[in-house]
């Protein structure tokens, strides 16, 4: 009998496996970039150019209620390149205490947004949303001192965040000078 092949884009894109363990999405999350007067929505596996993701995105949480709080992590598991990601993962952003039914601007930015700058190959940029047990739960224990070598699994375990409740990723690669014009 043939093994069942998953059609989940997070499995196909190896986000589940490389970054987090298998989970069931229970909250809807939207990630929207507004760079250079161009609005780009993030969909699993779609490609966005670095010039389209320069500014901090708006991440909307469509679930929970105002008494629920969420932690958002953005990471790149393909550093310095996808064929040899020995610096895996590179942390791009952490926002904690995001109230349900709001967006990331209502949370507490504990690691500032760093725009994607892929140098070698196609990188995956992953947004993960975790439900907190209470406000102020994710206190960066221990504090992040280096963005390279970040480990989402270890961070969520140390801060008792459990598995994600939502995730989305996009692909991004270095733009040629001709493309940026």
UniProtKB/Swiss-Prot annotation:
UniProt keyword annotations, A-Z: Cytoplasm, Developmental protein, Differentiation, Flowering
Q: List GO BP terms, alphabetically.
A: cell differentiation; flower development; negative regulation of flower development; vegetative to reproductive phase transition of meristem
User: Residues of the signal sequence?
Assistant: none
Family membership: Belongs to the phosphatidylethanolamine-binding protein family.
What Pfam families has UniProt attached to this entry?
A: PBP
How this chain assembles, per its entry, is: May form homodimers in solution.
Function noted in UniProt: Expression of CEN leads to a morphological switch between shoot growth and the development of flower structures (inflorescence). May form complexes with phosphorylated ligands by interfering with kinases and their effectors.
Please give the name of this protein.
Protein CENTRORADIALIS
Which CDD domains does the protein's record reference?
PEBP_euk
Family annotation (PANTHER family): PHOSPHATIDYLETHANOLAMINE-BINDING PROTEIN, PROTEIN CENTRORADIALIS-LIKE
Question: Per the annotation, which location comes first and is thus the protein's main one?
Answer: cytoplasm
Entries under InterPro entries matching the protein: PEBP, PEBP-like_sf, PEBP_euk, Phosphatidylethanolamine-bd_CS
Q: Where in the cell is it found?
A: Cytoplasm
Gene Ontology cellular-component terms for this entry are: cytoplasm; nucleus
